[in-house]
């Protein structure tokens, strides 16, 4: 850290170089730019070094003073060059100032000179060296304060006992402006000023004094009133009550009959009082109050009653001599009114009210559980009741009953698999505050679909026999006459679709269903319109049959329902020869017709068309997977 004692003629890098050359515990007392001189044969000789910096250091840790002359370096990598280093061992060491810029001192049996650049730095350096112990020497030379004389010890004198010398009469002075506090009185002039108000200006001054010092004046009046208050005076002439001197017959205070208040008797003219009458006789009964009548214990209020007695308006209670002012000023304590009984709490004379309420709550809770339990078993949403229910809580509102959701139509296939749309699963909407501890387990399902298809299917295995939905078993046998080991070709499916004649009975039903569906699935073909919510007509089915027939004639291949290998393919061509664009186009048409057909009413012809389309979709998906 750069200190202020370093010379102002040094640059920052030179000051840092100087600090690197000294110890961290050294303190710089004075410094200056100078030139080192040695005396030889009565002449001053300049050493080989250049201009340097003279430092006067103090080290309190090692307790020494030192004079160092070093040449700082502007390069931070170089250490400063020390030209002269002298440790001061003599306490009387001093420097001599030959002229304004030259200091001379004796060291190592010869004279050393310091030729300073600035005369002020030379003077400061000289004063620091000569006055390095000024504080300690000043304290030593300062005489001690004159204290008490030393006590002499002898055989008849104890030095530990304090001895006070008698003071002379000259040392005692008369008090200045001495007055007795109790005897302070107003002079005649002051009394005239105090008693008389000559003009309105003086009256205004008095009013201002009263307003400003109101608290002090009131406090003074209260003190005077308390000092003039007459305490109870004992009458010695009254007859003493004779009591037994036994332990149980103690002296009891006599109760004075003060049923009628006694008014102080004032004799004579009030404006001209008789000063011969003592204050005790005139104020004897002025502070006597009437005592409270003794009440019968049967009349006292019971704190357990809930009726609050209100009487007529009466004067505030006057304290007696036996009561304190604090207890007399408190309002009469009236028992608190008990809260009105609740509608479902019963007050029994000899049974605890809390236990009775608990028993009633348990009974109500059991009845409520018996009423709600059959409903819970039917619906399936179990409501958890808390163990302790407060009687003031509101009853839990029952969950609204939802109409049963119609499940999606189950389409039987020849492989014994039930295909159900993922969007057709019913979603259970249970309120957040109702718990469902026993949810229905979900069946083991597997995902089946195509990356390019628009609908994903969940297939769940079933061991049940497929339900017969058609009234024409001959057509079903014609289409699904083969087993899963022998796949059905597209040509056989197309032959069955040509014999289907759609009826117009499902048109009105399809219009109602289309109002509930916000957006139909996208259709990329020009044959079926995307905005048409009606089921497919015969005109829409015929072009589709032609497209399927053409694509089947190109491949002449039978595509199985499940994943097939090259051994399952029959015909001259392979599945890879058919263009993917034709399959995508036909697949989109099949999916669109299937969705519209599911919306309409279930009829024999429409169900047969739906099964045929489903079979074609499976063939195309199986082919695409194999491709």
From Swiss-Prot:
Residues 310-347 are annotated as: Disordered. InterPro entries: PH-like_dom_sf, WH1/EVH1_dom. It comes from the Eukaryota. Disulfide bonds: none annotated. Residues 21-136 form the WH1 domain. GO terms for cellular component: cytoplasm; nucleus. PROSITE patterns: WH1 (PS50229). This is Uncharacterized protein B0280.2. It comes from Caenorhabditis elegans.
